[in-house]
Amino acid sequence: MLPLVALVGRPNVGKSTIFNALTRTRDALVHDQPGVTRDRNYGVCRLDEQQPFIVVDTGGIAGDEEGLAGATARQARAAAGEADLVLFVVDGREGASSLDDEILAWLRKLARPTVLVINKIDGTDEETVRSEFARYGFSDVVALSAAHRQGIDELLDEVGARLPEEGAGELLDNDPARVRIAFVGRPNVGKSTLVNRLLGEERMIASEVPGTTRDSIAVDLERDGRQYRLIDTAGLRRRGKVEEAVEKFSAFKTLQAIEQCQVAVLMLDATEGVTDQDATILGAILDAGRALVVAINKWDGQSDYQRAQAEDLLSRKLGFVNWAEAVRISALHGSGMRELFQAIHRAHASATHEFSTSEVNQALEIAYETNPPPSIRGHVSKLRYVHPGGANPPTFIVHGTRLKVLPESYKRYLENFFRKRFKLVGTPVRFIFREGANPYEGKKNPLSDRQVARKRRLMRHVKGK
């Protein structure tokens, strides 16, 4: 396992900016508003190819043990507790604070190897800044400006000198066999609670306060001999209610997670039914062409009448995606977890199935013979052949003539026919229709000598009259 380095400090000292600089990504949300980061976010630093290590970004410790601030602090402490090296980040512009003193006292009790990182030294007198933090008694001090990428090399040298060859960090691998699952939905429907339930630990901060999760956090999981990557995302609200820049970034990260996943689990709240915002999120999943499982959370607390009402609303509002399986779960109590994973497996298998050209052509031939396209204003579309065009979602490219007049109802017939024939569940199916260009359009066949002579005779005959 790779060594693990944790970034720890009070809010808004630049931990996420350092994380992005070390990992050469923009995986961590960065904003000048305190408290943007809440959950632990892991990445890999490969700036030194000989000594890669895992970096964990943590939320700022604000000195409050209650509510979201307390949950964020517990996440930061958990990260520091499992780290091989702690980078204690402070703000060089603001100087040492009483909160920095409290964090330092806790780090000394933790007794982990620690390096003091003074960030935001651009525009300051570095010697003055260093002297202010000298009372902390660190022999290992790095002064840098993460926003301008100044001092990152010096930080790497300090980190590299103190890392063990083997560490506590587990690398998020890129194993193609690992199923990538994104949990998406409105705020406060239970996404983080569900991920924590599946992991068996409080890996994500779960709270009744809407908008607790602000970033997309990926965690690897092995269950029943299979590999997964679970992606917890921020709740998506109506665009008119997204006011803060941080929340706009969070929404972007959620949409990005949908694009990168293989299966999207759309979480609904059984107590609220299907809202317009749920339909909007579903639209983003369908636009991305991702496999879909609908998870109806908080099902255990509903009466028989409420469940019947919820079922009726589900069939009316989500009837256009009746190919997606709906699973009734309780993230809090753990009911429905096995059924959820079974639905995810079926959706993933359908979305990634590889088709042969012969089997899809046979299916098209049977569909065509069973129900030929109708005549539209005297024109009938002809479907000549089809071939696979990709997976996730399954895509079929149909070639033929007069396909522009092929009605939408017939396209839906083909989709339903292929779904039934190949037992495709939980995934969109796309058809691309292409008309072959007529190679003789605009060209005339050259006349033979016999045809030329005949044409001359006809012309003489016409002139003679």
From Swiss-Prot:
UniProt cross-references to Pfam families, sorted A to Z: KH_dom-like, MMR_HSR1
GO molecular function, one term: ribosome binding
Record: residues binding GTP 1: 9-16, 57-61, 119-122
Record-annotated EngA-type G domain positions: 3-167, 179-352
The KH-like domain, residue ranges: 353-437
Annotated residues for binding of GTP 2: 185-192, 232-236, 297-300
SUPFAM superfamilies associated with the record: P-loop containing nucleoside triphosphate hydrolases
GO biological-process terms attached to the record: ribosome biogenesis
Record's keyword terms, sorted: GTP-binding, Nucleotide-binding, Repeat, Ribosome biogenesis
Subunit-level organization: Associates with the 50S ribosomal subunit.
Task performed by this protein: GTPase that plays an essential role in the late steps of ribosome biogenesis.
Similarity-based family: Belongs to the TRAFAC class TrmE-Era-EngA-EngB-Septin-like GTPase superfamily. EngA (Der) GTPase family.
Protein name per Swiss-Prot or TrEMBL: GTPase Der
